[in-house]
Amino acid sequence: MSYNFDNDQNHYYFNNKNSLPIIFIHGVGLNQQMWKPQIEFFKNNSFITYDLLGHGKTPFKKPNLSMENFTNQLSNIVNYLKIEKFNLIGFSIGSLIAIEFASKYENYLNSLTLISTTYQRTAEERQNVIDRVNLAKKNMPISQMAMKRWFSDKYLAVSYTHLTLPTMIGV
């Protein structure tokens, strides 16, 4: 597997099999490695994975990022690779980026798939997301944050304490 950087220092992988590509957008605090099971499944198809701004090996460009920055990042990668049409899959914040991209650049899309997206978060939910981003910036393993969010302390103390997020999602 060969990973590359484009002119904007976006870290990506393009598996070009001369078919309509699938572009995968990961969630906050993760990187393109979260798509390993899907990469294996789609290895005979064209696909692109990439690290969002400030994630994985793609650096932050600005101290305060907006949805527009993430949407422009995807647009720049698509243009850099000269892709005219593709299937887009987003997970979590990747879904929000995919929605924003679709609203601006619908002519690029063959299909749009949203996984674990959100809609009309409360003020408390928005603050929780900001808190998770701040924790991720401090290098707290995202799997620990997710486990604490998904399971009670009692459950984690008694059951499956050996599991991490990668083993739970089959990575």
Regions found by a protein language model. Name each.
Residues 90, 94, 98:
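Gly/Ala-rich beta-loop-alpha elbow adjacent to hydrolase catalytic centers
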Residues 162-171:
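Single conserved hydrophobic/aromatic residue that forms the stacking wall/gate
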Residues 14-59:
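Conserved HGGG/HGGXW glycine-rich cap/lid loop of the alpha/beta-hydrolase fold
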Residues 99-104, 109-139:
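Flexible "cap/lid" loop of the alpha/beta hydrolase fold
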